[in-house]
């Protein structure tokens, strides 16, 4: 389910794909979706972490930004993801959306670069895994989207997304090329053996 909040009616994604702009409605509908899917034996993936709907831009075309403060995020999107995790979602989809406030919080210094969540260790590991306690599978949003590679070239982004916390890709651009990027990233040390094994274990689980 799309558990974004439609905070900016100019946003071309959330103004037609969310349960609305009311926090409790989004939580209730998201939990109902997870429950119904579970009853039918279907795994759910909640998206788009860390949350779309603040920016008015489209992450298909660039890396958009969730510009909320940590406190604002905790009270809105953070609350939603806490509830979805508690409700039993098995996967979370990471978005090509940056969140400078939590980058600064975890780094202890001003955020100097816009980094999509799909490439951010701070957002995937420190926020989603450690702070929110999610232990399921993390998947990227579609990697051919422009927002995925706005912070680095694709040869780096492909292995880096796994190294920094995602477990599986959604779509490739070119299967052979992306496989080569992954193997070369492993050989160059961009992707560690420990992280690769962890991702494989989560996929198999």
Task: Go through the PLM ranges and name each one.
Residues 187-205:
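Mid-to-C-terminal alpha-helical segments outside catalytic/metal-binding sites
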Residues 18:
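Conserved beta-strand positions that form and line the central face of beta-propeller blades
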Residues 21-184, 188, 194:
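Second-shell residues forming the walls of enzyme active-site clefts
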Residues 1-3, 47:
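Proteins with a high burden of low-complexity, intrinsically disordered sequence enriched in S/T/G/P/A and R
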Residues 3-13:
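Short, conserved phosphate-binding/catalytic loop or strand-edge motifs used
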């Amino acid at each position: 389910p799309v558990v974004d909040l439609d905070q900016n009616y100019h946003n071309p994604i959330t103004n037609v794909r969310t349960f609305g702009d009311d926090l409790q409605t989004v939580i209730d509908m998201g939990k109902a979706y997870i429950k119904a899917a579970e009853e039918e034996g279907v795994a759910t993936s909640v998206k788009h972490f860390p949350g779309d709907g603040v920016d008015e831009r489209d992450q298909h075309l660039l890396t958009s930004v969730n510009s909320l403060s940590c406190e604002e995020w905790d009270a809105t999107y953070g609350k939603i993801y806490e509830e979805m995790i508690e409700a039993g979602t098995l996967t979370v989809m990471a978005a090509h959306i940056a969140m400078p406030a939590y980058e600064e919080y975890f780094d202890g210094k001003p955020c100097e670069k816009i980094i999509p969540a799909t490439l951010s260790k701070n957002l995937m590991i420190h926020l989603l895994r450690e702070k929110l306690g999610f232990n399921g599978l993390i998947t990227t949003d579609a990697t051919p989207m422009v927002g995925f590679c706005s912070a680095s070239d694709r040869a780096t982004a492909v292995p880096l997304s796994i190294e920094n916390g995602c477990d599986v890709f959604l779509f490739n651009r070119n299967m052979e090329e992306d496989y080569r990027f992954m193997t070369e990233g492993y050989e160059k040390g961009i992707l560690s053996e420990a992280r690769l094994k962890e991702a494989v274990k989560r996929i198999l689980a």
